[in-house]
Amino acid sequence: MLFIDSNIFLEVELAQEHGVPAKNFLKAVQSGRLDAYTTDFHIDNVVIVMENYGKSWRDIAVFLTSLLQYRGLSIYHLTIYDKIEATEVMRDEGLDFDDALAVRTMKKLNIKVIVSYDKDFDRVKWVKRKTPEDLGF
Protein backbone atom coordinates (compact mmCIF):
# COMPACT_ATOMS: atom_id res chain seq x y z
CA MET A 1 0.00 0.00 0.00
CA LEU A 2 1.21 3.50 -0.88
CA PHE A 3 0.23 7.03 0.10
CA ILE A 4 0.03 9.59 -2.71
CA ASP A 5 1.06 13.16 -1.92
CA SER A 6 -0.74 15.99 -3.69
CA ASN A 7 2.36 16.97 -5.67
CA ILE A 8 2.07 13.78 -7.73
CA PHE A 9 -1.34 14.85 -9.02
CA LEU A 10 -0.08 18.41 -9.51
CA GLU A 11 2.84 17.27 -11.65
CA VAL A 12 0.25 15.92 -14.09
CA GLU A 13 -2.41 18.61 -13.81
CA LEU A 14 0.08 21.47 -14.22
CA ALA A 15 2.25 19.67 -16.82
CA GLN A 16 5.35 20.09 -14.69
CA GLU A 17 8.85 18.60 -14.92
CA HIS A 18 7.88 15.14 -13.63
CA GLY A 19 4.48 15.06 -15.35
CA VAL A 20 5.13 12.01 -17.53
CA PRO A 21 6.38 9.61 -14.83
CA ALA A 22 3.72 10.91 -12.42
CA LYS A 23 1.03 10.28 -15.04
CA ASN A 24 2.31 6.76 -15.70
CA PHE A 25 2.32 6.04 -11.96
CA LEU A 26 -1.24 7.36 -11.60
CA LYS A 27 -2.36 5.21 -14.54
CA ALA A 28 -1.13 2.16 -12.61
CA VAL A 29 -3.25 3.25 -9.63
CA GLN A 30 -6.19 4.02 -11.89
CA SER A 31 -6.07 0.55 -13.44
CA GLY A 32 -5.87 -1.09 -10.02
CA ARG A 33 -2.38 -2.47 -10.62
CA LEU A 34 -1.24 -0.47 -7.56
CA ASP A 35 -3.23 0.28 -4.41
CA ALA A 36 -2.86 3.65 -2.75
CA TYR A 37 -4.44 6.13 -0.37
CA THR A 38 -4.61 9.88 -0.25
CA THR A 39 -6.80 12.17 1.86
CA ASP A 40 -9.67 14.47 1.05
CA PHE A 41 -7.45 17.32 2.28
CA HIS A 42 -4.75 16.48 -0.26
CA ILE A 43 -7.35 16.37 -3.05
CA ASP A 44 -8.64 19.79 -1.92
CA ASN A 45 -5.06 21.05 -1.96
CA VAL A 46 -4.69 19.95 -5.60
CA VAL A 47 -7.87 21.84 -6.51
CA ILE A 48 -6.74 25.02 -4.73
CA VAL A 49 -3.36 24.98 -6.45
CA MET A 50 -5.00 24.30 -9.83
CA GLU A 51 -7.26 27.30 -9.26
CA ASN A 52 -4.28 29.46 -8.25
CA TYR A 53 -2.56 28.46 -11.50
CA GLY A 54 -5.58 29.68 -13.47
CA LYS A 55 -7.16 26.34 -14.28
CA SER A 56 -10.84 26.60 -15.21
CA TRP A 57 -13.76 25.10 -13.36
CA ARG A 58 -13.94 22.55 -16.19
CA ASP A 59 -10.33 21.48 -15.60
CA ILE A 60 -11.07 21.09 -11.91
CA ALA A 61 -14.27 19.14 -12.60
CA VAL A 62 -12.40 16.81 -14.97
CA PHE A 63 -9.71 16.19 -12.35
CA LEU A 64 -12.24 15.47 -9.59
CA THR A 65 -14.38 13.27 -11.83
CA SER A 66 -11.31 11.31 -12.93
CA LEU A 67 -10.73 10.26 -9.32
CA LEU A 68 -13.95 8.23 -9.46
CA GLN A 69 -12.31 5.99 -12.07
CA TYR A 70 -9.28 5.08 -9.94
CA ARG A 71 -9.78 1.43 -9.05
CA GLY A 72 -6.68 1.36 -6.84
CA LEU A 73 -7.25 4.64 -4.98
CA SER A 74 -8.92 5.04 -1.61
CA ILE A 75 -9.57 8.50 -0.21
CA TYR A 76 -9.31 8.78 3.55
CA HIS A 77 -11.69 11.35 5.04
CA LEU A 78 -9.95 13.25 7.81
CA THR A 79 -11.65 13.99 11.10
CA ILE A 80 -10.99 16.94 13.36
CA TYR A 81 -9.18 14.48 15.64
CA ASP A 82 -6.84 13.50 12.81
CA LYS A 83 -6.09 17.18 12.27
CA ILE A 84 -5.41 17.77 15.96
CA GLU A 85 -3.09 14.76 16.04
CA ALA A 86 -1.32 16.10 12.93
CA THR A 87 -0.27 19.15 14.94
CA GLU A 88 1.70 16.79 17.18
CA VAL A 89 3.45 15.45 14.08
CA MET A 90 4.20 19.06 13.11
CA ARG A 91 5.84 19.56 16.48
CA ASP A 92 7.69 16.25 16.61
CA GLU A 93 8.88 16.04 12.99
CA GLY A 94 9.12 19.72 12.00
CA LEU A 95 6.68 19.32 9.12
CA ASP A 96 4.10 21.75 7.78
CA PHE A 97 0.42 20.94 8.26
CA ASP A 98 -0.30 19.15 4.99
CA ASP A 99 2.81 16.96 5.29
CA ALA A 100 1.95 16.21 8.92
CA LEU A 101 -1.55 15.16 7.85
CA ALA A 102 -0.03 12.74 5.35
CA VAL A 103 2.29 11.25 7.98
CA ARG A 104 -0.53 11.03 10.54
CA THR A 105 -2.76 9.25 8.03
CA MET A 106 0.02 6.90 7.00
CA LYS A 107 0.62 5.94 10.61
CA LYS A 108 -3.09 5.37 11.23
CA LEU A 109 -3.40 3.18 8.12
CA ASN A 110 -0.03 1.45 8.64
CA ILE A 111 1.39 2.71 5.33
CA LYS A 112 5.17 3.05 5.21
CA VAL A 113 5.75 4.41 1.67
CA ILE A 114 4.73 7.82 0.36
CA VAL A 115 4.97 8.68 -3.32
CA SER A 116 6.11 12.29 -3.35
CA TYR A 117 8.69 14.72 -4.66
CA ASP A 118 8.72 16.51 -1.27
CA LYS A 119 12.05 15.81 0.44
CA ASP A 120 10.67 16.98 3.81
CA PHE A 121 9.31 13.45 4.28
CA ASP A 122 12.90 12.17 4.36
CA ARG A 123 13.18 13.57 7.91
CA VAL A 124 10.62 11.08 9.22
CA LYS A 125 12.62 7.97 10.09
CA TRP A 126 9.91 5.36 9.52
CA VAL A 127 8.58 6.89 6.26
CA LYS A 128 10.09 5.76 2.97
CA ARG A 129 9.67 8.38 0.25
CA LYS A 130 9.63 7.17 -3.34
CA THR A 131 9.16 9.08 -6.56
CA PRO A 132 7.35 7.59 -9.55
CA GLU A 133 10.78 7.25 -11.14
CA ASP A 134 12.01 5.25 -8.12
CA LEU A 135 9.09 2.88 -8.70
CA GLY A 136 10.01 2.37 -12.35
CA PHE A 137 7.70 4.89 -13.96
Where are each of the predicted segments found?
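Acidic, PIN/NYN-like endoribonuclease modules and their adjacent C-terminal/linker elements
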Residues: 1, 108-137
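Active-site neighborhoods of divalent-metal-dependent phosphate/nucleic-acid chemistry enzymes
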Residues: 74-113
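Acidic active-site catalytic centers that drive phospho-/nucleotidyl reactions
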Residues: 5, 99, 118
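Residues that scaffold the ATP/ADP-binding catalytic core of kinase and kinase-like folds
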Residues: 11-13, 49, 124
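Short, conserved alpha-helical segments within structured domains
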Residues: 38-42, 82
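Active-site-proximal, substrate-binding regions of enzyme catalytic domains
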Residues: 47-72
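Short, well-structured N-terminal submotif of metal-dependent ribonuclease cores
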Residues: 1-38, 53-62, 136-137
